[in-house]
């Protein structure tokens, strides 16, 4: 049995932000959300988040019924933060996994290894360590041949010989709670910062073993915007390597960004300057980009999207989007459609083999199959108070520069003459002409000049 405690009380002054550090976004999710997600496969019995600075904002940002919040009203160090758990874990006999809310790159497999080592060896505590190329500023961990911790020395207290040891304390711990609970009340703040350090408890609980994480990038903490950018680069490299090894082609990977919540199938091609975000799913054979943004959208097989923005929308197989199209607000586009340049779809549903080739706006509309929307057609969906829907039947065609004033329904096989402003429903198999008759006045320029 394991309880997880996540330290999320700090302000993060080096971020120079009013937003609590743990709520800053990394690849579409906050730092602390990434930490929480990493422990979910461990099936912890409880998930305790220790909050302090802007506590209510952090709670609001982490709305989940599975989380419990513990307040550290005054931030007096990591040891003091864990002391706040004493009344919440009274009588608990299992293990406590302690994580930092600003260390977002930890893999679940690393935490599983830490827990397994802890439980197999019946340790009082097990700590995560790593070997850094440049360990300056980190406490050094000294172990015997069996990885039993002998000593933890802060960087400022290291001798020249001790500084040659590059094994550092990552600040990730697993404790036998009974042992830790006995030590916590006796921690002292005998340091320049007058804080209570959890590392002081590590040396007092009993046998402590270290587990080394091979990829030191996993334990990198976020303290400023530069480190946040570095973490994003690491995350992107992981994600893009994963998809390329799974059969996805990335042309110029350095110019592409992909959230780790995106799902791609083999033989998808992503071109330069393309960004895939949120819960996007793209099926096999689709080609996205260059210069496109796809967010929270589902794209079928063999879809192409060029220089376009697609958010919160669904596109079926074989449809071509762009260049310079904008789909948003739960647009749903059928199979083998064409959405061309400078077309915007908002909360609109199009049937199969429907074309909106250029310079059109369809908002709050439904169109059937094999519809052709002429250049410059718009749905006037807003009357100044609320929005109304436009319904367009199968095989209907609108001429260039048509305005469909909602609420309005066009039946099947309707033809809308170019330049028409349609304000009333049109029955099936009809031609609608809604424009002023053309008038020609011969000799107009000469006569106007004489006057």
Curated annotation (Swiss-Prot):
<dbReference type="GO" id="GO:0008360">
    <property type="term" value="P:regulation of cell shape"/>
</dbReference>
<keyword id="KW-0808">Transferase</keyword>
<dbReference type="InterPro" id="IPR001451">
    <property type="entry name" value="Hexapep"/>
</dbReference>
<dbReference type="InterPro" id="IPR038009">
    <property type="entry name" value="GlmU_C_LbH"/>
</dbReference>
<protein>
    <recommendedName>
        <fullName>Bifunctional protein GlmU</fullName>
        <ecNumber>2.7.7.23</ecNumber>
        <ecNumber>2.3.1.157</ecNumber>
    </recommendedName>
</protein>
<feature type="binding site">
    <location>
        <position position="400"/>
    </location>
    <ligand>
        <name>acetyl-CoA</name>
    </ligand>
</feature>
<keyword id="KW-0963">Cytoplasm</keyword>
<dbReference type="Pfam" id="PF00132">
    <property type="entry name" value="Hexapep"/>
</dbReference>
<dbReference type="InterPro" id="IPR050065">
    <property type="entry name" value="GlmU-like"/>
</dbReference>
<dbReference type="GO" id="GO:0009245">
    <property type="term" value="P:lipid A biosynthetic process"/>
</dbReference>
<feature type="region of interest" description="Linker">
    <location>
        <begin position="226"/>
        <end position="246"/>
    </location>
</feature>
<keyword id="KW-0677">Repeat</keyword>
<keyword id="KW-0511">Multifunctional enzyme</keyword>
<dbReference type="InterPro" id="IPR025877">
    <property type="entry name" value="MobA-like_NTP_Trfase"/>
</dbReference>
<keyword id="KW-0460">Magnesium</keyword>
<feature type="region of interest" description="N-acetyltransferase">
    <location>
        <begin position="247"/>
        <end position="451"/>
    </location>
</feature>
<comment type="similarity">
    <text>In the C-terminal section; belongs to the transferase hexapeptide repeat family.</text>
</comment>
<dbReference type="GO" id="GO:0043886">
    <property type="term" value="F:structural constituent of carboxysome shell"/>
</dbReference>
<keyword id="KW-0133">Cell shape</keyword>
<keyword id="KW-0548">Nucleotidyltransferase</keyword>
<comment type="function">
    <text>Catalyzes the last two sequential reactions in the de novo biosynthetic pathway for UDP-N-acetylglucosamine (UDP-GlcNAc). The C-terminal domain catalyzes the transfer of acetyl group from acetyl coenzyme A to glucosamine-1-phosphate (GlcN-1-P) to produce N-acetylglucosamine-1-phosphate (GlcNAc-1-P), which is converted into UDP-GlcNAc by the transfer of uridine 5-monophosphate (from uridine 5-triphosphate), a reaction catalyzed by the N-terminal domain.</text>
</comment>
<feature type="binding site">
    <location>
        <position position="435"/>
    </location>
    <ligand>
        <name>acetyl-CoA</name>
    </ligand>
</feature>
<dbReference type="GO" id="GO:0003977">
    <property type="term" value="F:UDP-N-acetylglucosamine diphosphorylase activity"/>
</dbReference>
<keyword id="KW-0479">Metal-binding</keyword>
<dbReference type="GO" id="GO:0000902">
    <property type="term" value="P:cell morphogenesis"/>
</dbReference>
<feature type="binding site">
    <location>
        <position position="375"/>
    </location>
    <ligand>
        <name>acetyl-CoA</name>
    </ligand>
</feature>
<dbReference type="GO" id="GO:0071555">
    <property type="term" value="P:cell wall organization"/>
</dbReference>
<dbReference type="Pfam" id="PF12804">
    <property type="entry name" value="NTP_transf_3"/>
</dbReference>
<feature type="binding site">
    <location>
        <position position="223"/>
    </location>
    <ligand>
        <name>Mg(2+)</name>
    </ligand>
</feature>
<feature type="binding site">
    <location>
        <position position="418"/>
    </location>
    <ligand>
        <name>acetyl-CoA</name>
    </ligand>
</feature>
<feature type="binding site">
    <location>
        <position position="223"/>
    </location>
    <ligand>
        <name>UDP-N-acetyl-alpha-D-glucosamine</name>
    </ligand>
</feature>
<dbReference type="GO" id="GO:0006048">
    <property type="term" value="P:UDP-N-acetylglucosamine biosynthetic process"/>
</dbReference>
<dbReference type="GO" id="GO:0005737">
    <property type="term" value="C:cytoplasm"/>
</dbReference>
<keyword id="KW-0961">Cell wall biogenesis/degradation</keyword>
<feature type="binding site">
    <location>
        <position position="346"/>
    </location>
    <ligand>
        <name>UDP-N-acetyl-alpha-D-glucosamine</name>
    </ligand>
</feature>
<comment type="subunit">
    <text>Homotrimer.</text>
</comment>
<dbReference type="GO" id="GO:0019134">
    <property type="term" value="F:glucosamine-1-phosphate N-acetyltransferase activity"/>
</dbReference>
<feature type="binding site">
    <location>
        <position position="139"/>
    </location>
    <ligand>
        <name>UDP-N-acetyl-alpha-D-glucosamine</name>
    </ligand>
</feature>
<feature type="binding site">
    <location>
        <begin position="7"/>
        <end position="10"/>
    </location>
    <ligand>
        <name>UDP-N-acetyl-alpha-D-glucosamine</name>
    </ligand>
</feature>
<feature type="binding site">
    <location>
        <position position="102"/>
    </location>
    <ligand>
        <name>Mg(2+)</name>
    </ligand>
</feature>
<dbReference type="GO" id="GO:0016020">
    <property type="term" value="C:membrane"/>
</dbReference>
<dbReference type="InterPro" id="IPR005882">
    <property type="entry name" value="Bifunctional_GlmU"/>
</dbReference>
